[in-house]
Swiss-Prot record:
Gene this protein is translated from: acyP
MF terms (GO), sorted A to Z: acylphosphatase activity
Keywords: Hydrolase
Record keyword Hydrolase present: yes
Residue numbers annotated as active site: 20, 38
Superkingdom, natural source: Archaea
Species annotation: Pyrobaculum islandicum (strain DSM 4184 / JCM 9189 / GEO3)
Organism taxonomic ancestry: Archaea, Thermoproteota, Thermoprotei, Thermoproteales, Thermoproteaceae
Catalyses which reaction(s): an acyl phosphate + H2O = a carboxylate + phosphate + H(+)
Domain Acylphosphatase-like: 5-93
Protein name, UniProt field: Acylphosphatase
Amino acid sequence: MENVRAHLYIKGKVQGVFFRQSMKEIAVRYGVRGWVRNRSDGRTVEAVLEGPRDAVAKVIEWAKVGPPGARVEEVEVDWEEYKGEFQDFRILPTV
């Protein structure tokens, strides 16, 4: 299975609804590594996902809906070169 890397920007009502924790749980379930964090604009969550293409695709599909309480308006996905730099999936501080 081919490994891929995706850089996501998820916009809408995605902060204050447990989006990051929920994404971490979904990513771990599918064996995806990387990170997720809030952006300081108050309406964007950013994430980098690495893993098998089908697993990353499942996390991206989940991100289009998010957890209960979220209202996702847009998910921008930038495909990047796979680096294999992550050992796990983490929640990073807001930037």
